[in-house]
Amino acid sequence: MSLLQIYWRALGYLAADKRRVALICGANVALAAIAILEPIMFGRVIDAISEHGSVFSTLAVWAGLGAFNVIAFVLVARGADRFAHARRSEVLCQSFERVITMPLAWHHQRGTSNALHTLLRAVETLFSLWLEFMRQHLSTAVALVLLVPTALSMDVRMSMVLLGLGVLYVGIGRLVMKRTKAGQAAVERHYHKVFAHVTDSVSNVAVLQSYNRLGHEAETLRRYVKNLLDAQNPVLDWWAIANALNRLSSTISMMVVLLIGAYLVTHGQLRVGDVIAFTGFATLLISRLDQMSAFANQISEARAKLEEFYKLEDSAADAAEPDGLRDLTNVTGHVRFEDVGFEFANSGQGVSGVSFEVQAGQTVAIVGPTGAGKTTLINLLQRVFSPSTGRILIDGIDTRTVTRKSLRHSIATVFQDAGLLNRSIEDNIRVGRADASNVEIHAAAVAAAAQDFILAKSGGYDTVVGERGGQLSGGERQRIAIARAVLKDAPILVLDEATSALDVETEDRVKEAIDELRRDRTTFIIAHRLTTVRDADLVVFMDKGRVVEMGGFAELSLRNGRFASLLRAGGLLNDEEVRRLSRSVQGEAA
């Protein structure tokens, strides 16, 4: 994107309140015009003094303009500040909402810390641009437009010096922006690397402390910061050179203007007041050119930050759902996979040709070795990804034709990592349903076997669980997650390794709550511990993205295939168990 496109898009965020922007812009135009009158008034005063005329009327007008200028400037600055702060807050909230509503696949692709860093830095950059636009950029542009013809009307010869100075400023600015474009982009990349390293290290501080990696991480950060400074310093050097050249050019230009003015006065072609007024114009023009140079520096620095932000917003818009999707309502829980296939970009992994059917209220266990595609299958069910081939039907409706919000409303998930927020226990349970009453929250906790340990804590339901639930035990965190799913009361339940991180005793307590939660719900269980799949109506064994075996627990145990081999390897299937299962199957057949 060009600098003009970047700047214009940044100003587009102000269009939410066009009337307010127009009022501030109009006031800026008036202030710019008043600023041009001051050198003229000063010149008139000097002429009056040199000609022994009356100066009081001119001084009175000048004083009135000055007082108006001060009051108007304060009001404009106050209005611009308040409006810029309000827009920053609104854009931050809008962008945050847009980012968190994106599919998980979008977050996996971009990285959470990268999106967060891009968002925060861009919002601050936008705020600075808005503030400077309403305070200086517009008034500078108006002043330059008015100054040039006014100066030409006073004296063409001295004006040509100022025009040459303006051309020189523009040339220096363009040269420096061209020289620093790649460097500024590199600076932004290094900022992202520093932020990502800090976020990653702090998020995993327990692991780093355990392995005595704190010194190494700090040293790595110092290396990243050094690389950042190494990239930043050449950019700063170029702008320092630009400022020095601009200062030198403006000083020489003022000397030339004064020399020309002195010559014209001595030859009777201009009055002293005219020269003084023109030098006032020259000083004003130079200050505006300095502001223009600062603006060029600011927009050049903002380019890399805002380009990333615009890409983020555009990708979020591209990932947004199309119009016309229906809501999934009155779900009974009948789920069918029809020849479903999906492949991850760059890895070739995924699932292929998956077909099975789950009746409403049944439990299906998806098992298999690591990397078999179990979690991918569940992600496809929840439309984290969309199938590249085949389709997934819920109550006969293709999930790609319904809104993600209504689909998620129909599915409750209990993850291996409970995923608790650093808030109270009540707030964490309320994630399941925001409008739930306290009675409903307590009932969900009772159903999840969590009520006793919650009430045993000094803060009860107001107890803050800490970051990622760090103040609770593993079993307590899982029961809070189960209570959340109970409160959601969705017709489809997903248990994603929900008990694999628990010890046997804690797992038994949590399993009772899970069994209660599964009742009358279509349930998908992803499990490594095969003890958790005994009660499943259907077992789907996957390997390398394909369904290898499928059937009931007893059926697959007796088939002596991959599933039975896993059971035997885990000590869960022996000859006695085979005979018992065989008698059970024969009894059902009879």
Curated annotation (Swiss-Prot):
What keywords are assigned to this protein? ATP-binding, Cell inner membrane, Cell membrane, Membrane, Nucleotide-binding, Sugar transport, Translocase, Transmembrane, Transmembrane helix, Transport
The residues the record assigns to binding ATP are 368-375
Query: What is catalysed by this protein?
Result: [(1->2)-beta-D-glucosyl](n)(in) + ATP + H2O = [(1->2)-beta-D-glucosyl](n)(out) + ADP + phosphate + H(+)
* Enzyme Commission number(s) of this protein: 7.5.2.3
**Keyword Cell membrane appears in the UniProt entry:** yes
Q: How does it sit in the membrane?
A: Multi-pass membrane protein
Residues in domain ABC transporter? 335-569
Task: List localization entries.
Answer: Cell inner membrane
Q: What cellular component terms from Gene Ontology apply here?
A: plasma membrane
InterPro entries given in the database record:
AAA+_ATPase, ABC1_TM_dom, ABC1_TM_sf, ABC_transporter-like_ATP-bd, ABC_transporter-like_CS, NdvA, P-loop_NTPase, Type_1_exporter
Could you give the domain comment from the record? In NdvA the ATP-binding domain (NBD) and the transmembrane domain (TMD) are fused.
Subunit structure of this chain's protein: Homodimer.
Q: What is this protein called?
A: Beta-(1-->2)glucan export ATP-binding/permease protein NdvA
